Amino acid sequence: MERLRSSTRVLALLVALGVAGCAPASEIGSAEPPGRQSSKSALRPAGVLAAGSIASNEEPTRDTGARTPSLGSVREDEPYRGLGTWIDIYDHEVWQHPTRSVRSMAAHGIRTIYLQTSNYNRNQPFVHREGVEAILDAAQERGLEVVAWYLPGFADVATDLHRTLRSILLRTKAGNGFDSFALDIESPEVRRPVVRTRRLLRLSEAIRRRAGAEYPLGAIVASPHRLVRTDPYFWPGFPWRRLADLYDVMLPMTYYTYRVRGPQDAAWYTAQNVQIIRKETSGMKVPIHVVGGISFDATGPETQGFVRTVENKHVIGASYYTYPGITLDQWKALRTLR
């Protein structure tokens, strides 16, 4: 997901830091398919996150006593619906002016901010801790959702899990936290695909177990077109169906600017990624949120082609990677996805 260049919801989390008895240590408007939640719940024990559940020699997470809201009226894929935008750890202008950036996002009709916390080769769970908290507070004031995302390397699953849970548990002084968490699944740090898959699933199962059955989780997957057609040796045996069971939404990296040029080809590439996920998860009807871009390289007409396909394919949401590169022409096209 990273560029190739130098009172918020806490669903199903019975969180009380320091409380005893914690658990052990590249389709807009469609409805969630009937029975999906009940079948998942049967497979996932409800988890309880607490400070003792993650070994930590890093900065402790605050407990503000924020209220856990009722779960009955909240959909698992809700944070992923509609128009979103992405911030990674290299978007320095956002980190320097977080509140102003959120204000601008809201003015452009953004519903959800996808915010990177860290990655596997950093030595802390939050690269920009103050900026993360400022964005969470500003987003809460403007009614925007915020989804945390993290890039694991799978070489150290314990660290990847620890950092994921730190994101889920994070609270600002005002009591605000992330609305969901999404795992960025693309790193080839572990060279053997079979080992990489085993560790991905071990990490994903641990995240689901700790977060609980109702907490919304997203799987950010490398371009399905690449995984299945143009570079099948990159990750043979990619576990599409198991991921669709563990996560509530799939977010394919549909970076057509790496592969094609022009609005028609951008539309074609976007359609391919959606169709491949639906084929690989046949019968599961997994919700899809398409991540387009790269914004720094895309044109206005290409963005229109992307949007046209997103609307035609009935995904639950779409976004562009990343926010600072989105031009006025791109915004004009993207606004129709609100």
What feature does the model see in each segment?
Residues 85-90, 145-157, 200-237, 284-297:
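Aromatic-lined carbohydrate-recognition surfaces of secreted/lumenal glycan-active proteins
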Residues 90-107, 158-174, 231-243, 299-309:
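Short, acidic/polar
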Residues 115-151, 191-219:
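Aromatic-lined substrate-binding rim segments of carbohydrate-active enzymes
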